[in-house]
From Swiss-Prot:
Heme b b562 binds at residue 51. Its main location: mitochondrion. It is a multi-pass membrane protein. This is Cytochrome b. Component of the ubiquinol-cytochrome c reductase complex (complex III or cytochrome b-c1 complex) that is part of the mitochondrial respiratory chain. The b-c1 complex mediates electron transfer from ubiquinol to cytochrome c. Contributes to the generation of a proton gradient across the mitochondrial membrane that is then used for ATP synthesis.
Length: 100
């Protein structure tokens, strides 16, 4: 699970950087810049889909990682488990801020 999480995170960072190169955050042209990415940028639609679906896959891998920890009783290691919970909360907050 950890290697899949790392791969998903790397894909998210790379696709996010490529999308940020063409995105305009001005309120009057934000939608037009997304349409520009999908229509005019080479494989822009694919990069956008990888970025959107990669986020879902990232969280599925996180939940599977947590489920494995619950199954094997890793919650008994309190320090490690608490750090994992903090990382999960930080990841969820970052995803929310990135979505908004």
């Amino acid at each position: 699970m950890g290697s899949l999480l790392g791969l998903c995170l790397i894909v998210q960072i790379i696709t996010g950087l490529f999308l940020a190169m063409h995105y305009v955050s001005d309120i009057s042209s934000a939608f037009s810049s997304v349409a520009h990415i999908c229509r005019d940028v080479n494989y822009g639609w694919l990069i956008r889909n990888f970025h959107a679906n990669g986020a879902s896959l990232f969280f599925i891998c996180i939940y599977l990682h947590i489920a494995r920890g619950l199954y094997y009783g890793s919650y008994l290691y309190m320090e490690t488990w608490n750090i994992g919970v903090i990382l999960l909360l930080l990841t969820m907050m970052t995803a929310f801020v990135g979505y908004v």
